[in-house]
Design a protein with these regions (language model features):
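Conserved N-terminal helical subregion
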Residues: 72-137
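Anionic group-transfer/hydrolysis microenvironments
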Residues: 6, 34, 114
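N-terminal FAD cofactor-binding segment of flavoenzymes
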Residues: 44-86
């Protein structure tokens, strides 16, 4: 089979790219050498989170996956910046910013990486224009 676009890498960014191209009508093959770990308690699960700021949330809405994510998203209402530069690796200055000072919306939303992989994999399965082949390199 021929594809318009091949995405090499089925992590969060690769699956997001595949979903975006697929939503635009391109035929897409997304490959990754390993299947995504989609269960929080599975060995090797990525327990970190990713923050999506407002423009990224709009992009996720545009490509059709935000409805799958919104119920799991934690608002990023306060952003704390810490200065730990210099010779000693210690925090010297911190500053907190509250999103309500500039907007009715939070700065963004945090989502667990393992959950993003699960939801993106399920979303790709529902796109007729995208073939997701984990376990392929």
């Amino acid at each position: 089979m021929e594809y318009d676009i091949i995405v090499s890498g089925g992590g969060i960014a690769g699956m997001a790219a595949a979903a975006a191209f697929g939503a635009d009508g391109y035929s897409v093959l997304c490959v990754d050498p390993a299947p995504p770990i989609t269960d929080r308690d599975a060995e090797g699960a990525d327990l970190r989170s990713t923050a999506f700021l407002q423009p990224a949330q709009a992009f996720l809405e545009e490509i059709g996956i935000w409805p799958r994510l919104v119920q799991h998203a934690m608002p990023l209402q306060v952003m704390r910046i810490a200065d730990a530069g210099g010779q000693e690796p210690e925090i010297r200055v911190t500053k907190a910013f509250d999103a309500s000072d500039i907007s009715d919306l939070p700065f963004g939303w945090n989502l667990p990486n393992w959950l993003l992989r699960r939801e993106f994999a399920a979303h790709l399965e529902g796109l007729k224009t995208v073939t997701f082949k984990p376990g392929t390199s």
